[in-house]
A protein has these predicted regions:
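Active-site and NAD+-binding cores of ADP-ribose-processing enzymes
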Residues: 24-117
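Long, hydrophobic N-terminal alpha-helical segment
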Residues: 1-29
Length: 117
């Protein structure tokens, strides 16, 4: 599974919250590579958020994502961010036959601002 976000800012935040707090130190944040990809819209499905409104839990989202991945209904699936619920992440299934349609548009170094720690 390739985890992407609808914006660079969301991708950075999603990554940042996964860094253990004891590793968040000035001048020690990781240098990453920001990659912008072009994916045809018709290859991305939107997740039915209403089905999870009651619980909106990580296990529920994972189960739904696993079902989508195994079924190979689409190359991509838009899912709500657990960090900012009004924003969307996009899961890409690298085993899907349409994966060759994904193009890398930009690839550049990404640095976290030390003021985040």
């Amino acid at each position: 599974m390739v985890y992407t976000a609808s914006s660079l800012a969301l991708a950075a935040l999603e990554y940042f919250v996964g860094i253990p707090s004891h590793l968040r130190k000035p001048n020690e944040l990781p240098v990453l590579t920001a990659v912008a990809m072009e994916v045809p819209d018709h290859l991305i499905d939107a997740f039915n958020v209403a089905s999870l409104l009651e619980s909106y839990g990580i296990p529920d989202c994972r189960l739904a994502g696993e079902g989508w991945s195994v079924g190979q209904r689409s190359l991509g699936l838009m899912v709500p961010s657990q960090v900012i619920r009004r924003e969307m992440n996009i899961l890409l299934n690298p085993a899907h036959p349409d994966m060759p349609h994904v193009q890398v548009a930009v690839s550049e170094p990404f640095f976290f601002d030390d003021r985040l720690v």
